[in-house]
Amino acid sequence: MMTEPNGPALDALDGLSVGDALGAQFFVPETARSHFTGRTDPPGPWPWTDDTEMACSVYAAQRERGTIDTFDLTHAFALRHDFDRGYGPAANRMLRLIREGGDAKALAAELFDGQGSYGNGAAMRVAPLGAAYADDLDEVVRLAARTAVITHTHPQAVDGAIAVAVAAAIAVRARTGTMTPETFLGEVVFHTPIGAVRDGVIEAIALLAEPDPLVAAKVLGNGSRTSAADTVPYALRCAARHLTDYRAAVWEAIAPGGDMDTVAAITGGVVASCTGTRGIPAEWMAAREPLPGWAFPEPGGVTGGRGRADMLVPRSHPVPDVEWTDEQWQRLRAGRHTDTLDHRWAVHTHEGSVRICRPGGGHPVWEVAVTRIRGGRRPVSAVVETSHHRWSVLPTDPHGLTTLSWILRTAAAGERSALRP
């Protein structure tokens, strides 16, 4: 069950974004020389980077629906992609192609000669999700993995996202009691799949007593390779050592150089999950560039689909010539259409696809994949149930395409109209 959207999840987003924005200041050599040694604050404002932009999309998605719709989140990443926020070349290309109608799953899977990205991008954005589902660590693991593979399909990247999300969830739980750094990281190890990230967190436990961050980073990494395995263990070590001291944790995250904005974002998101926004220095919050307004949609403004069993015999179906404005798409997503459709059809969305069922049946007759276009959405593919054991439509039946087109137009318009055939 998701926590209050203005509670730990927002705390994690604030902590992540402040760490990201402060860390990014130290890529400027003059700032690094003049401010780091004395730990004095660089002059504001501090712009945030791609770390925060993507984390805002994660936060907005779960705030709006009360869960994560990976189709919508994928296209939110692409729609809000700002080239100047510091995305890597592979991410820039992939998000641009998704925005132009490319297959998101195929684009993510083909990165790095088909291995998928093993970078730290999935880990850097996930703390608000972990904080939101702190009551259910199994759900944290499941959702962290689902949101990771949108852009990062390599197991190391997925494991990095899981480790950070679990750490944020455990940090929320630590608000009501005390937790040693060893216990904190031990819980992360327990829930992280076997692999390089988990091994790194185990090494981080062994280095908790090491006072010199440069020594620890030499073993664990500092994000300079931009891989999850080179980033997550050190970031979580900083969080574990200073779980109730946001300032100390973030300064330690920045200390060894490397991918300073991302390491500080991960550390800051986890620590603020424990301390709350009140634990973040007020002057740092004031210096951080304000978060975008789109990150704060109306809570619960869109409800999820009802869920259903899969089709028995799906077949490709002609794609209706239909386009929806953004307003019409929101009406479709709200899922209240049976009265408009003469109580013969129920329409809802699930992970961005439109599903059309008989009321009370739950089994889809059609499922229509949708992509964003300028000013709205349009269908890009459709499948239909052809099993004789259920209400079925033959793909070659022209009446089927007519009916599907009528359903999609009428449900989006919200006004009853006659089905002529």
Model regions: which residues?
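A structural detector for beta-sheet-dominated domains
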Residues: 348-350, 371, 385
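Negatively charged, low-complexity tracts enriched in Asp/Glu with abundant Ser/Thr
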Residues: 296-351
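Canonical SH2 domain fold
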Residues: 353-372
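Structured, active/binding-site neighborhoods that engage oxygen-rich ligands
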Residues: 1-299
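Hydrophobic residues embedded in beta-strands of well-ordered beta-sheets
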Residues: 352-354, 377-378
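Polybasic, proline/glycine-rich intrinsically disordered low-complexity segments
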Residues: 377-421
